[in-house]
């Protein structure tokens, strides 16, 4: 084994890599998380999609460590015998001492090996281990917090496993243990407390305190430096959890977060600056449709249109060919996920479309699981009526076609008055009468348990979007995960996303954001924010995100009302696009898929592991940190198909126009403005200040020559036109509705 290895630049700008290809022969990687073969939240997606890339790098020296769950093992894991004698002795030793440890292969792409620890079977040691945690780390865990108690059991079992594995190996390998989130953090703290020779990494996908604070309607990002973190955690009764998370962040050799915005948050709340940002990727191959993705969009849209026909029966007075489908999906966190600002923007969009006489209709879906007790009867009836109409039309069509065929067969033109008999007319009239309804189409597809206090329904009542015939924006709240077996909307989530036109995710708190990333790899434009990890990442890597269908909403430096105005502008501009423009934009969006592939983003994790090895084993690995400017990284240029700005265009002919007063190379008039590079640079320096976001920007023109404005346009650029009046007073909304 070489005694020293050095790190150098990889093909990815800004990241370090081994000078030679890393040889994992004498190194073992354990990735520890509560969501290994146990779907709870987004970390499950991270581990599942990243397993193939990590397995290609580490081979059979890569193991995932997670909790044993009967459901997970029965459906996702194939139990196996350990492949190495050291690992077999480790499991046998733990099982003989009262633990239950299982080994198998996770049945996902890449087929990683997993070690599953039965937390419940070790509950006999909980009180003793909680006492040891207090003696070692001064962290006390209350008896009533089951999740925290499970974290203690899981942490001690993980540490026991790693220590036993090292003891059973005669040739001590270099062990890297990567812990995800606070639920696995206890194990990291104990590894350091017991001085195990393990290189440790801790990744936080969202800080505990940050999620709680943002859910409480706090001006979070403007007060990051002012929070009394101990007091805030104590008031929310999560102080012990916060201590676990903070201790893990400080004990780790390498601390990482999933985005730059979360890194800022962690620096202030956990009091340690992350060593590296490890963005979340996707298995792009799973979503790849090559040139077929436009056809898939049309097919999926047809499935959604079938649902819309049934849902709006009796009020289907809008053209489905001129209807756009927007959606928001995710955990039901009304403010954190931006459902509040989305609803307000939809009300303003409805006003703009009505005032301007637009023929476009927008159907906005809210896919957020909530507490329900059954399907809405009106919604089920709508789908039944649609199917009945379809059956009636098919019956009449078959009779009509048979009579037409027989008439043509004898060589005569059919008598149109005899093609349909009275029975057919009666059947069609009954079908028409069935489509009549007195009430508006329902907003919610299910019966909500907390109908009167539900935040989405309460807001809809306030803004008055009741799916009336006069509304150009329709709202459908589907408080359940999508499934292809549903009697209402029988499509899975991926098919639904492909059929929509725009995903809207104006989140206030979103450490990464898989939903807009999934839209991107499927070629669907999306709206994200500069407070989400995905939005910050795309803003950093793309010169003009909006040209690629990635709209970045400013929620960090603008007020809530101004952010809502900007979102309204994005939505209205999107509605003004032609069908051809939307097709071109979807093509551009789909091109960004490779940027989100784990084959690219997995290198950030590689860099974190190399950094941890260099810190844990400095005698064998060296690491030379250095700063790299973000501008040195690759940035997607503006698409060539986007029309250039008029200010940057050039004459297409060398000959002057008749209305030009002077030749292009001739002397300038005295009253015209000369361009002085140093003077303009000085103006720019004077204009660099904290962003101020006025409600409307004003433009001034001067006579006698062109004058440059002394203000800098700090708003995000967009290749689409924005409405002249993106806002109207709330009173105007009410007057128009009345």
Curated annotation (Swiss-Prot):
Which transformation does this protein catalyse, written as a reaction?
A: [(1->4)-alpha-D-glucosyl](n) + UDP-alpha-D-glucose = [(1->4)-alpha-D-glucosyl](n+1) + UDP + H(+)
Q: How is it modified after translation?
A: Phosphorylation at Ser-8 by AMPK inactivates the enzyme activity. Primed phosphorylation at Ser-657 (site 5) by CSNK2A1 and CSNK2A2 is required for inhibitory phosphorylation at Ser-641 (site 3a), Ser-645 (site 3b), Ser-649 (site 3c) and Ser-653 (site 4) by GSK3A an GSK3B. Phosphorylated at Ser-641 by PASK, leading to inactivation; phosphorylation by PASK is inhibited by glycogen. Phosphorylated at Ser-641 by DYRK2, leading to inactivation. Dephosphorylation at Ser-641 and Ser-645 by PP1 activates the enzyme.
Q: Which gene encodes it?
A: Gys1
Q: Where does UDP-alpha-D-glucose bind?
A: 205, 211, 331, 510, 512-513
Q: What residues does alpha-D-glucose 6-phosphate bind to?
A: 291-292, 294, 297, 301, 501, 582, 586
How activity is regulated?
Allosteric activation by glucose-6-phosphate. Phosphorylation reduces the activity towards UDP-glucose. When in the non-phosphorylated state, glycogen synthase does not require glucose-6-phosphate as an allosteric activator; when phosphorylated it does.
Q: According to the UniProt entry, which residues carry Phosphoserine?
A: 8, 11, 412, 641, 645, 649, 652-653, 657, 672, 698, 709, 711, 728, 732
- According to its UniProt record, in which pathway does this protein act? Glycan biosynthesis; glycogen biosynthesis
Protein EC: 2.4.1.11
Query: Phosphothreonine occurs at which residues?
Result: 722
Tell me, what is one Gene Ontology molecular-function annotation carried by this entry? alpha-1,4-glucan glucosyltransferase (UDP-glucose donor) activity
Q: How does it assemble?
A: Part of the GYS1-GYG1 complex, a heterooctamer composed of a tetramer of GYS1 and 2 dimers of GYG1, where each GYS1 protomer binds to one GYG1 subunit (via GYG1 C-terminus); the GYS1 tetramer may dissociate from GYG1 dimers to continue glycogen polymerization on its own.
Tell me, what does this protein do in biology? Glycogen synthase participates in the glycogen biosynthetic process along with glycogenin and glycogen branching enzyme. Extends the primer composed of a few glucose units formed by glycogenin by adding new glucose units to it. In this context, glycogen synthase transfers the glycosyl residue from UDP-Glc to the non-reducing end of alpha-1,4-glucan.
Record-given protein name: Glycogen [starch] synthase, muscle
Q: Which cysteines are joined by disulfide bonds?
A: none
Instruction: Give any Gene Ontology cellular component.
Output: cytoplasm
Q: Where is the composition biased (Basic and acidic residues)?
A: 682-695
Q: Where is the composition biased (Low complexity)?
A: 698-738
Which residues does the record give as UDP binding sites? 39, 331, 515
A Pfam family annotated for this UniProt entry? Glycogen_syn
* BP terms from Gene Ontology: glycogen biosynthetic process; glycogen metabolic process; heart development
Q: Which domain of life is it from?
A: Eukaryota
Region Disordered: start-end pairs:
632-738
**Protein family according to the UniProt entry:** Belongs to the glycosyltransferase 3 family.
């Amino acid at each position: 084994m070489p005694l020293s290895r050095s790190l150098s630049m990889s093909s990815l700008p800004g990241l370090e890599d081994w000078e030679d290809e890393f040889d994992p022969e004498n190194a073992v990687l354990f990735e520890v998380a509560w969501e290994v073969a146990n779907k709870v939240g987004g970390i499950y997606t991270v581990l599942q999609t990243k397993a193939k890339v990590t397995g290609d790098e580490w081979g059979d020296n890569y193991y995932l460590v997670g909790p044993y769950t009967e459901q997970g093992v029965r459906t996702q894991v194939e139990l196996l015998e350990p492949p190495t004698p050291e690992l077999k002795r480790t499991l046998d030793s733990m099982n003989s001492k009262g633990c239950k440890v299982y080994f198998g292969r996770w049945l996902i792409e890449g087929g990683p090996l997993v070690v599953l620890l039965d937390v419940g079977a070790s509950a006999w040691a909980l009180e003793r281990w909680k006492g040891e945690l207090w003696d070692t780390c001064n962290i006390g865990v209350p008896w009533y917090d089951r999740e925290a108690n499970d974290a203690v059991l899981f942490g001690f079992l993980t540490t026991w496993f790693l220590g036993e594995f090292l003891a059973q190996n005669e040739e001590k390998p270099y062990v890297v243990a990567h812990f995800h989130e606070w639920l696995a953090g206890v194990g990291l703290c104990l590894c350091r407390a017991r001085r195990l020779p393990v290189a440790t990494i801790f990744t936080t996908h969202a800080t505990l305190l940050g999620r709680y604070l943002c859910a409480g309607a706090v001006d979070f990002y403007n007060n990051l430096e002012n929070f009394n973190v101990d007091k805030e955690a104590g008031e929310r009764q999560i102080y012990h959890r916060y201590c676990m998370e903070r201790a893990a962040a400080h004990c780790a050799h390498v601390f990482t977060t999933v985005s730059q915005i979360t890194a800022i948050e962690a620096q202030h709340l956990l009091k340690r600056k992350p060593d590296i940002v490890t963005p979340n990727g996707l298995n792009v191959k799973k979503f790849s449709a090559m040139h077929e993705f436009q056809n898939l969009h049309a097919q999926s849209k047809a499935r959604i249109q079938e649902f819309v026909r049934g849902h709006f029966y009796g009020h289907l007075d809008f053209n489905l060919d001129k209807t756009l489908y927007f959606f928001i999906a995710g955990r039901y966190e009304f403010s954190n996920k931006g459902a509040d600002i989305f609803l307000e923007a939809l009300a303003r969009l409805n006003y703009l479309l009505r005032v301007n006489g637009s023929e476009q209709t927008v159907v906005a879906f809210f896919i957020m699981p909530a507490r329900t007790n059954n399907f809405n009867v009106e919604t089920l009836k709508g789908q039944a009526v649609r199917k009945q109409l379809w059956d009636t039309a098919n019956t009449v069509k078959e009779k009509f076609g048979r009579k037409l065929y027989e008439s043509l067969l004898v060589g005569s033109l059919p008598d149109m008055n005899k093609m349909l008999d009275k029975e057919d007319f009666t059947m069609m009239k009954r079908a028409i009468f069935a489509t009549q309804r007195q009430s508006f189409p329902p907003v919610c597809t299910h019966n909500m348990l907390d109908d009167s206090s539900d935040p989405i329904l309460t807001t809809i009542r306030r803004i008055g979007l009741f799916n009336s015939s006069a509304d150009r924006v329709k709202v459908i709240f589907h408080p359940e995960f999508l499934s292809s077996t549903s009697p209402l909307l029988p499509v899975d989530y991926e098919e639904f996303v492909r059929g929509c036109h725009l995903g809207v995710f104006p989140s206030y708190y979103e450490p990464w954001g898989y939903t807009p990333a999934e839209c991107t790899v499927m070629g669907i434009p999306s709206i994200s924010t500069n407070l989400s990890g995905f939005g910050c990442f795309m803003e950093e890597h793309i010169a003009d995100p909006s040209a690629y269908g990635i709209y970045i909403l400013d929620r960090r430096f603008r007020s809530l009302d101004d952010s809502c105005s900007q979102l309204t502008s994005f939505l209205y501009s999107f509605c003004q696009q032609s069908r051809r423009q939307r097709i071109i934009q979807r093509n551009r969006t789909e091109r960004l898929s490779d940027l989100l592939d784990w084959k690219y983003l997995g290198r950030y994790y590689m860099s974190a592991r190399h950094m941890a090895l260099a810190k844990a084993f400095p005698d064998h690995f060296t690491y030379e940190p250095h700063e790299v400017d973000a501008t040195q990284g690759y940035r997607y240029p503006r698409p060539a198909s986007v029309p250039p700005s008029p200010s940057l265009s050039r004459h297409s002919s060398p000959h002057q126009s008749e209305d030009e007063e002077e030749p292009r190379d001739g002397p300038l008039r005295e009253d015209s403005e000369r361009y002085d590079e140093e003077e303009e640079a000085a103006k720019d320096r004077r204009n660099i200040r904290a962003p101020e976001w006025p409600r409307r920007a004003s433009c001034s023109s001067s006579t006698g020559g062109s004058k440059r404005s002394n203000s800098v346009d700090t708003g995000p650029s967009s290749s689409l036109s924005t409405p002249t009046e993106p806002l109207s007073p709330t009173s105007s909304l009410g007057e128009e509705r009345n």
